[in-house]
Structure formats: C-alpha cells, structure tokens
C-alpha cells in the first residue's frame, strides 16, 4: 500500500529499495533505448570508416586506370601518327576517331561525376541521420 501512495506522489521504489522519480520500468526502457542508440551510432561510424576506405580505394584505382588509358592512347597515337604522316585521308580518319573518342570520354566523365555526386549525397544523408 505504501508503494501505491508513493506512486501517486510521483515517487517509485526500485528492486534495490531505492527511491526513484521515474518508474523503474520506464527507466529500464530508457536505458535500453540509449544502449541501442549508442550501438547504432557505433555501427554508423564503422560504416563511414568502411565507405571512406572503399571510396579511397576506388579513387586510387580510377587514377591508375586513367593513367594507363592515357599511356595507351599516347602509344596508339604515336603509331597512328607514324603511319598517317604520309596519307592525308588516313590523317582525317584519325582526327575523326580521336574526336569521337574525346566526346565519348567527355560523356563518360559527366556520368562518373553524376554518380559521384549521387554517392556523396547518399553518404551525406546517412551521416545526417
């Protein structure tokens, strides 16, 4: 009967017979929510670390690929130039091919930038929540 009167007054007695201002069940739920929130925060930090490492790896790989593409294009262009120096028709064809390749690379660059922007927005949204 004493516990009921204390509860009416907004006071509660826990399992250790200590006087509390919050119902022990509510306090337990709050502690559980706090623990889950902390666990989620740790998981989010782990995700950020993992995605950051992945992004760095992808950027490094992209730089290597781009370097190799440029090197291959230089070798090909050198070979084509050596062959085409004597033939103006072949020179015009090479110019057209290089123009088309340049346009394709420009479009590819735009697509990659768009994907990068979307990924940055996604990561930003995840870090804000």
From Swiss-Prot:
What does the protein in this record do?
Answer: Component of the intraflagellar transport (IFT) complex B required for transport of proteins in the motile cilium. Required for ciliary entrance and transport of specific ciliary cargo proteins such as che-3 which are related to motility.
- Record carries keyword Protease: no
Write out the coiled-coil annotation as residue ranges. Answer: 89-121
Q: List the disulfide bonds.
A: none
Q: Which gene encodes it?
A: ift-20
Answer yes or no on keyword Zinc: no
Q: Which GO terms describe its biological process?
A: cilium assembly; intraciliary transport; protein localization to cilium
Instruction: Quote the subcellular location field of this record.
Output: Cell projection, Cilium
Q: Which keywords label this protein?
A: Cell projection, Cilium, Coiled coil
> One Pfam match, by short name?
IFT20
Question: Which species does this protein come from?
Answer: Caenorhabditis elegans
Quaternary structure and partners = Component of the IFT complex B composed of at least che-2, che-13, dyf-1, dyf-3, dyf-6, dyf-11, dyf-13, ift-20, ift-74, ift-81, ifta-2, osm-1, osm-5 and osm-6.
* Primary site of residence: other
**What are the record's GO terms for cellular component?**
centrosome; ciliary basal body; ciliary base; cilium; cytoplasm; dendrite; intraciliary transport particle; intraciliary transport particle B
The protein's name in its UniProt record? Intraflagellar transport protein 20 homolog
- Enumerate the InterPro entries for this protein: FT20 (IPR028172)
């Amino acid at each position: 009967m004493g516990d009921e009167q204390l509860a009416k007054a907004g006071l509660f007695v826990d399992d250790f017979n200590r006087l509390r201002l919050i119902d022990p069940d509510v306090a337990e739920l709050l502690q559980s929510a706090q623990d889950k929130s902390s666990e989620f925060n740790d998981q989010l930090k782990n995700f950020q670390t993992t995605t950051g490492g992945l992004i760095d790896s992808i950027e490094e790989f992209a730089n290597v690929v781009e370097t190799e593409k440029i090197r291959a294009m230089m070798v090909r262009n050198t070979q084509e130039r050596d062959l085409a120096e004597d033939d103006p028709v072949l020179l015009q064809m090479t110019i057209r091919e290089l123009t088309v390749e340049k346009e394709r690379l420009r479009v590819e660059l735009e697509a990659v930038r768009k994907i990068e922007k979307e990924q940055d927005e996604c990561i930003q949204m995840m870090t804000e929540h």
